[in-house]
């Protein structure tokens, strides 16, 4: 089912990042300012990394519920249906990337990111990182901002 087929069934968010191809937001700020209801199933046309640093609950992706706890990182692709159970209790980072940002398939690192992480058919759409990795990732996100 592609994004156009989802029109009318789920709220569609197509505002892809522009400029340098990615945008970083922080939870709960971007969730509270959002023009959509993130607690309702929705779909968008960009890649998104959701890093949950604090809070616990459920994040539903493609009709499957996944437990959220600190250190959980979701990798969402265009067209995936997802929603949060309660957006006010989460703190973390959202990195949104337009499809052009992920288009480079000449670099082995880009291929791995795109197909081993975002489009992995044999693994759930998330990873859980430990505290040391979270510190390193926090520095990387800071540098990206």
Question: Which role does the model predict for each range below?
Answer:
Residues 65-67, 81, 126:
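Well-ordered beta-strand positions in beta-sheet-rich domains
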Residues 54, 78, 97-99:
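Residues immediately flanking
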Residues 2-21, 85-145:
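A hydrophobic/aromatic-rich effector-binding and dimerization subdomain
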Residues 63-77:
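Short acidic-glycine-tyrosine-enriched beta hairpin
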Residues 58-60, 76, 81-87, 93:
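Short beta-strand His + acidic residue motifs that chelate non-heme Fe in jelly-roll/DSBH
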